[in-house]
Swiss-Prot record:
GO terms for cellular component: endoplasmic reticulum membrane; Golgi membrane. It comes from Arabidopsis thaliana (Mouse-ear cress). The gene is ICMEL2. The keyword Membrane applies. This is Probable isoprenylcysteine alpha-carbonyl methylesterase ICMEL2. Substrate binds at G158, G159, A160, Q229, S230, A231. Its EC number is 3.1.1.n2. It is an enzyme of class 3 (hydrolase). GO terms for biological process: response to abscisic acid. Pfam families: BD-FAE. Catalyzes the demethylation of isoprenylcysteine methylesters. May act as a negative regulator of ABA signaling. It comes from the Eukaryota. One of its GO terms (molecular function) is prenylcysteine methylesterase activity.
């Protein structure tokens, strides 16, 4: 069954249809049918009985998890070869590939711990299908408690528009779930499987799915936050702008911008005209970037900062939610100026917007090294405090929450920071 990019029916009408997708989708989705948290808890609590049947259930579940892990590993490997094929053999790419390999090895102790939880935690519902295209899946991170409706974060991961993958948001999802926040990490078609319009369409459809169905998982449809990191910040901001424009024109919509309480943009770029040469010099060559973005003639359409200057979209700008941009001052992958100029453009259009700049932080410090370090994390605390701002009980719980566990020794984090290609 193909789901219309503009419409997503209620979950109860589509539960059976979602299982009838392509072989590739079934390989990665496995037997992970859409089910509510109540079903998840019932399955987990059913692991004890007198006739010994739970052992068979656990063995079958373990086998499915192993199969799913193998399928996910295959996909990640294929994405890596996609990157290899499209970047070609150049000195910039080779040096960054070697640096990336060293970077990943240094952080491997943390990655392995996160991967184990991703594949085997009962709080993670992997590869829920939200649309009819390949890669139209999302992961849900569900808090351990089930009292009351929870706030929701829809997260669109980065990956240079080429290697984005929903599991990249697993650490964020696991940590926010511990603070009683549901997280939906969206997957989407990457280049060359799709170009920027496909990515934006996928993100919009994933957001629509969450808006229309998250209540079945204990999520509050009136407390949904949209967040994107790096390329994901660009894609999600484009999806948000497109939706606001459609809404301002009175077009048929399956979700409303008013359902998004706030937008968090982390280390993103929002003006393609200012980024093409920068990316070329860093190894994402101009020809590839133009192919991803459907040519320079499409730059304006997919540059939210530029579109704000168009008087025809000012009505749409008035519909946008509170926008908070986060950036590290030492980010060389996407210059911090990208968030500053976007904030200025938003404020000039009378959109409620603010910029939070983290001194000395790089592109990966905010999203990887700092969360792996454990303990206090300014970005994490800022996001949680904004989500829980109207919930006094949640704020009290946050104040006494135990410090987050360190996942990687400090000396490895420092070495990783030195060799990071980002």
């Amino acid at each position: 069954m193909q789901l219309s990019p503009e419409r997503c029916r209620p979950m109860s009408e589509n539960r059976e249809a979602w299982s009838a997708n392509s072989e590739e989708m079934e390989l990665l989705h496995g037997s992970n049918r859409l089910s509510s948290p109540e079903h998840v808890r019932r399955r987990v609590s059913g692991n004890s009985s007198e006739d010994g049947s739970p052992r068979i259930c656990r063995q079958q579940s373990f086998g499915r998890d192993i199969g799913h892990a193998a399928a996910e590993t295959y996909l990640i490997t294929r994405l890596s070869f996609n990157l290899l094929g499209y970047l070609g053999v150049g000195y910039r790419w080779i040096t960054r590939l070697l640096a990336l390999a060293c970077y990943a090895m240094l952080l491997m102790p943390g990655f392995l711990q996160v991967a184990y939880l991703y594949f085997f935690s009962s709080q993670v519902r992997r590869s829920i299908v939200y649309g009819g295209h390949p890669r139209n899946r999302l992961d849900l991170y569900i808090p351990p408690t089930s009292d009351g409706l929870k706030p929701v974060v829809v997260f669109v991961t980065g990956g240079a528009w080429i290697i984005g993958y929903k599991a990249w948001g697993s650490l964020l999802g696991l940590q926010l779930a511990e603070r009683d926040i549901i997280v939906a990490c969206l997957d989407y078609r990457n280049f060359p499987q799709g170009t920027i319009s496909d990515m934006v369409s996928d993100a919009a459809q994933g957001i629509s799915f969450v808006c229309n169905n998250i209540s079945a998982f204990g999520g509050d449809p009136n407390r949904i936050y949209l967040m994107g990191q790096s390329a994901g910040a660009h894609i999600s901001s484009c999806a948000l702008f497109e939706q606001a424009i459609k809404e301002s024109r009175g077009e048929s919509i399956s979700w409303s911008v008013s359902q998004i309480k706030a937008y968090f943009g982390l280390s993103g770029g929002y003006n393609l005209f200012n980024l093409v040469e920068h990316f070329h010099n860093r190894g994402l060559y101009r020809s590839i970037f133009l192919s991803i973005m459907e040519g320079e003639e499409s730059f304006k359409q997919f540059s939210p900062e530029v579109r704000l200057k168009d008087l025809n979209v000012r009505k749409a700008a008035a519909l946008l939610p509170h926008i908070i941009l986060f950036h590290g001052s030492a980010d060389y992958s996407i210059p911090p100026e990208a968030s500053k100029t976007f904030t200025d453009a938003l404020q000039a259009a009378e959109v409620k917007a603010e910029l939070v700049m983290y001194k000395g932080k790089t592109h990966t410090d905010l999203f990887l090294q700092d969360p792996l370090r454990g303990g206090k994390d300014e970005l994490f605390d800022h996001i949680v405090s904004m989500i829980h701002a109207d919930d006094s009980d949640a704020l009290r719980n946050d104040a006494v929450a135990p410090p987050r566990k360190r996942l990687v020794p400090e000396f490895l984090l420092k070495l990783a920071g030195r060799v990071s290609p980002f």
